[in-house]
Amino acid sequence: MTIGSDDLTANTSIKQIVEVIDERDKPEKLMKCLEKYTNADTKNRMIVFVLKKTDAVEVENELWNKGYNVVSIHGDKDQWQRTKALESFKRGTANVMVATDVAARGLDIPDVEAVINFSFPLTIEDYVHRIGRTGRAGKEGTAHSLFTQQDYKLAGCLVKVLKDAGQEVIDIESCVRFILNLTKLFVSRCPLRCLNLT
């Protein structure tokens, strides 16, 4: 990963999938993602990133009620609670960890098969850090992001990161144009400085 004002790249061993969806469809899409990346033979480790602490609690409770072995890490937890959750995730006792960006940097968790961005991050740098939790130590990983109309300001920069990592971006470009048309915004008003979509 390289981060700088004009030089931002993602690990090319991470398959990046971006779904442009309606905000209301996120809970259903999350369940489909978890089903997709869960392997019956192994306990695939997955991190689900959210923006807010309240979202972390809500998503953790929902997944627990659906039968997932899940823990969460966020700013309202004491350090000992975060450490306990992290150890449970590393040991495989819990195979899903719901986290705010407190877990996006500095944590070395081996064998995370998938990162799911339930809430898209506020900056493209945070996106690159989040997805960097998978595809570590020469292994491949998957980053699946749910991108909504509210995230449109990062669309151009996201497309650039995807292209630079050799990912398929045709669908997201079309969807970004669609979102911009729906919201009657013009490219000149949007911070799409990273890529000209016209």
Predicted region positions:
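Conserved helicase RecA-like core
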Residues: 1-198
